[in-house]
Amino acid sequence: MGKYLLTLAVIFTAGHSSINLSAQTVLETVQVEAYRLSSPEALITGALHIVDSASIHSFAASDLSTALNGIPGVKMETRGDGGSRRLHVRGSALRSPYSVRNTMLYYDGFVLTEADGNSPLEWIDPDLVQSLSLVSGPAAASFGGAYGGALNIYTPSFTKSATHAWVHSQAGTTGNNDLGINTRISSGVDIGFENMGVSISAIMTDNPGYRTWEWNNKTQLNLRFKYFDKAGGIHSMLAGHFDGDWALPGAIKQSQVDTLPTASPGADYNAHVARLRDIAGYKFEKTFNSGWEFSTSLLGRFTSKTNPYGTSQFYKGYKEESGSGYSLLASAGKRIYEGNVWSLDFEMTVMHLDDKIHITELESEPSELPTGIIIPMRYDLTMNAQQNFVSTSWVATRLNNFRIEGQIGLSNRSRTISGWTPGYGGLRNRSSSPLYSDNVSTLHSIKKTHSTILPRIGLSWEVAPGYSLFAQASTGFSDPTAFELVNPEDGQISELDSESAFGMEMGIRAQLYDQVKIGFTAYQSSVNSAILQVVQENDAIAFANIDGGLIMSGLELEIDYIISDQINIRAYGSQTLHHFGEETDHAGNSLPGSPRTSGGVQLNSNYSWGTARLNTRHIGETPLNNEGSSVMDAYSVIDASVSINLPYDMSLELGARNILDAEYSAWPQLNGVYGKFYNPAPPRTAYLSIRWGI
């Protein structure tokens, strides 16, 4: 195996590439900030990972998983290419069984994360993204919450007085010849004027999946507008529509994986998600003559979802969800002192999130039945959630080689849950209860409020040119989401408390030679009142606050080696020690979903004729349940591709994923009942992608 990998590495050595801008004047440049603060790379006070367009668009990516999985300590999982998605950052896996929690999501300065902490990662399509940055670990003083960090998405810049259109078409195998091929067609046009730019794009995807019930499809429309006024203000607007459906295949046992990996128990219940999202937003930015930099954004959102199977025993049920809300973000900053030795910068941010979510769950899916047949309702609940956040930052820099940052934030969150759930021991009141008439119902109105002081301190020191040390300590929190509202065992409201977290990290960045750069980080985080999955008496998966805490510690390493002007190698890896606290029922056991080791090698090479890439990734043994009695075997995956430059600004990419035909589960079902832990990933697949710029 080692010789085979080495041979592949030599053949497919690959390099860095990025989207080429024309030679015309660019109206703007994307600036990546660390902890809301502009900083030279050498003086960033914590772990910040930046991913360029080449990594985001490579290997026929349908989402950000390829890009994010190349970051140490990060694991993005999907059920089928383009299906359900979840994101784990430094051990935050247990709060993300079906979605993205514990990680704040920003899109060109707009807050996409909702007030309950859920982040709609399905909105982010690679064809919309120029670059991204990820801050790992607790950083609530900077971003308002989420002990898993913050993900910042940046879209392409506009080009002055130029029009650029593009088309991207893609087709690939799924690993199951009986189901057909997956397809993508996306196109857009960017129009740049003297003082404004407009971008319109549309994306359509369809994937029949590898397993018999693993299909997904989506249609997405996007609009961006930017205007530069004569007074120096920058006005940005965005709007978009997302219409996506994805099947929920359901986890299976190891015996089924060995004999029929395409088996999908969810097919028997029509288990799937149908999601609609609409967003619209406005942002204003300006730098004043006094030196103040000001930015504010307002984003409105609407969503609806239908979900046959609900959260009940044996996967039966039908759930409907609708929600609306908005996010407001404003910040101002200025260098308030600059001397010969020291400089002092000040920044302040205010954020408000407000969302209303209505969820109804029925005993079974509505159907074309005769009038008069009533389908029993399990619950009918509305959650109103708000977050208010204010934070100030003070940054002192000495001689451009030493920096200390202090941030203090205050967060106030409230959520009110009202509506009906099944009741027990009370009097039936059919006239006042909208629930089914043959059971008792209970009216609820529950309010929870949390106020948290959020400090952060960080420092960095460039001890010699190219060699920097950094350290920081910071806090975080995570509130219960709408998904965790109801206990599936008895249908009652789960009165969960907010999680709190504290994290520390320290590390080094070193430019060993002109060609070699390394980064090393050691971290430790603790989480109190952790919200974890527990298995109920009816085998349903529920959530509960666990006393005793969680401990997440680990080591992360990155190495970049530029072999020549064409060839670049990047290696990364992490070693984790994530476990339950000593006062928990599972003291000392490893946290499910956190591989003990992970890493990979990326080889890239640019030539006049095109680009070649090789991506290897290894995931070590992964615990699957709280008791530590079940472990998923380690696995390695290798992807390879070749891109060829064609006339008329066209490019053709040919590639294969999982070329060694590794057998593994891309989505382990943590704490799965009856041994149902596995969602098998596709075997070897191939794809063809064509991009055309006009």
Indicate residue ranges for each PLM-predicted region:
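Membrane-embedded beta-barrel scaffold of Gram-negative outer-membrane proteins
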Residues: 283-287, 293-307, 462, 468-476, ...
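Short acidic/polar hinge/loop motifs at secondary-structure boundaries
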Residues: 110-138
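Surface-exposed extracellular loop regions of Gram-negative outer-membrane beta-barrel proteins
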Residues: 245-247, 251-259, 352-373, 414-438, ...
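N-terminal periplasmic accessory domains that precede
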Residues: 64-65, 86-90, 103-107, 119-122, ...
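Transmembrane beta-barrel wall of Gram-negative outer-membrane proteins
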Residues: 178-249, 271-293, 332, 336-340, ...
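Gram-negative outer-membrane beta-barrel transporters
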Residues: 168, 338, 397-401, 412, ...
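Extracytoplasmic beta-strand/coil segments of soluble accessory domains associated
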Residues: 65-110
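Flexible loop and strand-edge segments within Gram-negative outer membrane beta-barrel domains
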Residues: 211-214, 228, 232-281, 300-323, ...
